[in-house]
Amino acid sequence: MIHKTLEKHSDIMAREYNIADIGSGISPVTPDISKTVFIELEKQAVDFLRKQGLNAVKGDITHLSFQKESFDAILCSEVLEHVPNYKKGISEMARVLKKNGLVIITVPIHQKYWKDDDEFVGHCRRFDPETLAKDIKASGLQIVERKPIGSRLERWLTWNIVKIARRKGNKEMNANKVKLFAFYAINTLLLQFIKIAAALTSEENSSIILFAAKKN
């Protein structure tokens, strides 16, 4: 999905480019790891990525240690919901994004879907799509795509996966939260069902949304 969005709204795949993947944890979403800088807040994730031979740095999305207009594209998938001052995070991404660059953001949406698993994985909020759209525009970015990519099925599965995992003990799981969603990565069939459900779900009923925005 990230790859297709990049191809749809940017020509960077046809030329030399660099990407920042912010908060990827141990599951990068970039289409080309060799051209990507991975920016992670957690030292554990940085160490893991470096052991895989990847270019990973410790960093905070609200205080990025890069000069302005450093990246052709920025990926920020399931990150802003963890950030208290998320507006600063958006403005920092806009600052380090090159002119005509593309930022892709995905976040959980709609407070009606809030459950205890949101709190367990460190969510500060579930976003209102309209509010987030205004915040993205306020940073100087132009939204070129707005697409629901979640569903009630995704929400139900996520809640139950976390519920089952928590039964193993909070101490163990707090040290391995990053592994909770590996289930999705290895179960191709289930992923297909999730994608189909998302494609049939309206923004009003979606659990996750994708924004793609350009810097003009």
Predicted features and spans:
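Residues lining the SAM
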Residues: 77-80, 106
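Generic C-terminal helix-cap and adjacent flexible tail
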Residues: 215-216
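Active-site micro-motifs of SAM-dependent methyltransferase domains
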Residues: 63, 81, 111
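Conserved N-terminal segment of class I S-adenosyl-L-methionine
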Residues: 1-69, 73-77, 90, 126, ...
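A generic secondary-structure micro-motif detector
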Residues: 35-36, 79, 83, 121-122
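S-adenosyl-L-methionine-dependent methyltransferase catalytic module, highlighting the catalytic core
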Residues: 5, 84-92, 96, 102-212
